[in-house]
Structures are given as C-alpha cells and as structure tokens.
Amino acid sequence: MAATSEHTILQFVSPSSTASATTSVLTARIHPLVIFNVCDCFVRRPDSAERVIGTLLGSILPDGTVDIRNSYAVPHNESSDQVAVDIDYHHNMLASHLKVNSKETIVGWYSTGAGVNGGSSLIHDFYAREVPNPIHLTVDTGFTNGEGTIKAFVSSNLSLGDRQLVAHFQEIPVDLRMVDAERVGFDVLKATSVDKLPNDLEGMELTMERLLTLINDVYKYVDSVVGGQIAPDNNIGRFIADAVASLPKLPPQVFDNLVNDSLQDQLLLLYLSSITRTQLSLAEKLNTAAQML
C-alpha cells in the first residue's frame, strides 16, 4: 500500500502578479513637492502623534513607473494593535484634488519614520482597497542615519494555501526628479543640522569663487590645446567663443562701478531686512504682553 502525504505550501503572492503588465511597479518617481509636503505635515503634526500619514497622488506611466506628483495628509490615530483613519476626510480631499487635476489619481500612501511597522500593514490594506498595488513611501524625518532617507515599498502577501497570513513589504527603486535649484534646497534640508544659511553677500562670494574656478579651468584647457598636450575639440572651442562674445565690452573702471553699485544695493537690502525683523520681533513681544495683561 503506497503511503501518501500532503504538503502545505507557503508562498508569496504579489498584487502585481494578478494585475496586467502595465501596472507592475518598476520605479517610484517622486517630485520634490511631495517630500516638502510630507516634511511640512510632520512639523505641523499634533504633539501626541509620533508620525503622519497621507495619500500620494500621481499617475502610472506605460513602463510601469509610478509618477508621484502630489500628496495630502490624512488624520489618523494609531495604537499598538489598531489604526483609525479618517476616511471621510480622505475622500473629501481626494474629491477636491480631482476637481483641480483629474489626471492625478491615488497611487499609494506615505508615512514618516525610518521604515514600516505593524500599523503599516493595516493602513496599506485600506489603500489596497482604494487602488490596486499601492506604493508605500517612507520619509525618515528623524534623520536616523544622519539624513532624511526616502524609501518606497510594494506589498506582497505571504499565504498558507488559500489563507493569507501576513504582508511583506518589498523595497523598490526611488527616482527623485529635481532641477538644480530644487536639489540645492533639498540637499540643505536633508542634512541633520544647518549651521547657517548663506545670505545674499555670502552667496555672491561663493558664486564669484566658483566663477573664478571655472575660468581657471578654461585657461588650463586652452593652454593645453595650444601646447599640443590634448587634442582640440571644435564644439568646446565654439562654446568658449560664444561665451566670450556674450560678455559686454566695458572698461574696467565702468565694470568696477557697476559691481560696487550692486554691492551697495545688497547692503541696503540687508539693512532694511534687519530693521524689519527687529520691528516684527518687537511687535510680537508687545502683542504677547498685551494678551497676558
């Protein structure tokens, strides 16, 4: 008599495996507005809240990349074993956003913190009922590793036969889409601490130092070409010629006068802004004292 045995198989079931190929998530493309919104909501959170959550809005590109362009916070209460989300507020905010831009739909949700926790699975289940295969974005506002780490996850279900046991979060690549001006601000904000933001004069000094460095690099390149050390590049030569031709033909004395006039304007603006800050600080103290009386 042949012996028979039955085996129970544990398997991962990804939500994307049941969806079409166009909805499989490859990369989360995040625009800087989303990160700044998350940080702003975290700063304004109630004192009792350890983290904030919110809805991510955007679209799914043909290659499966999730383009995250906007977000809004959603009030919630969280304990060790349960999570309460203000669903009415979420739906009202979504309706308001759709009136402004109907092309932006729900693509996932975000939370602040170093990673996922027990409550993340419950919140992710809610958003999975709102949209197939949602993205979970985490922003480390506590600077655990010395900077604000940004991660994105998708969820896979660990099932025992037909029974779903637990959700497994799998990290996916994150692409921060920023222009140079946005990246400068982001690099300053993501640091643990900032000693001092440069004022206008310090910014001008840094710009001039960088300009001098670039001019020296051009001099070295031209000297190397003339000396036969490197082969000439016609494209670089035309670019340098166009840059030199775009400079106004001014006598040195006139140029010095223009720079000095601009410097005087900067000093005047700094003086006026200092007076304004002093006046605002004094008015705030007087207003506080009047309310206490």
Swiss-Prot record:
One biological process term in Gene Ontology: pollen germination
Expression by tissue: Expressed in inflorescences, leaves, stems, siliques, roots and seedlings. Accumulates at highly levels in pollen grains, developing embryos and root tips.
InterPro entries with a match to the protein in the record: eIF3f, EIF3F/CSN6-like_C, JAMM/MPN+_dom, MPN
Record keywords, A-Z: Acetylation, Cytoplasm, Initiation factor, Protein biosynthesis
One term under GO cellular component: eukaryotic 48S preinitiation complex
Location within or outside the cell: Cytoplasm
TM regions (residue ranges): none
Modification type N-acetylalanine: residues: A2
UniProt-listed Pfam families: JAB (PF01398), MitMem_reg (PF13012)
Predominant place of localization: cytoplasm
Disruption phenotype: Male gametophyte-defective. Disrupted pollen germination and embryo development. Hypersensitivity to exogenous sucrose.
GO terms for MF: metallopeptidase activity; translation initiation factor activity; translation initiation factor binding
Superkingdom classification of source: Eukaryota
Domain MPN: from-to ranges: 28-159
Function as written in the Swiss-Prot or TrEMBL entry: Component of the eukaryotic translation initiation factor 3 (eIF-3) complex, which is involved in protein synthesis of a specialized repertoire of mRNAs and, together with other initiation factors, stimulates binding of mRNA and methionyl-tRNAi to the 40S ribosome. The eIF-3 complex specifically targets and initiates translation of a subset of mRNAs involved in cell proliferation (Potential). Involved in cell growth and differentiation, especially during embryogenesis and male gametophyte germination. Regulates sensitivity to sugars (e.g. sucrose).
Quaternary assembly: Component of the eukaryotic translation initiation factor 3 (eIF-3) complex. Binds to TIF3E1 and TIF3H1.
Family: Belongs to the eIF-3 subunit F family.
PANTHER family membership: EUKARYOTIC TRANSLATION INITIATION FACTOR 3 SUBUNIT F (PTHR10540:SF6), EUKARYOTIC TRANSLATION INITIATION FACTOR 3 SUBUNIT F-RELATED (PTHR10540)
Protein name: Eukaryotic translation initiation factor 3 subunit F
Organism: Arabidopsis thaliana
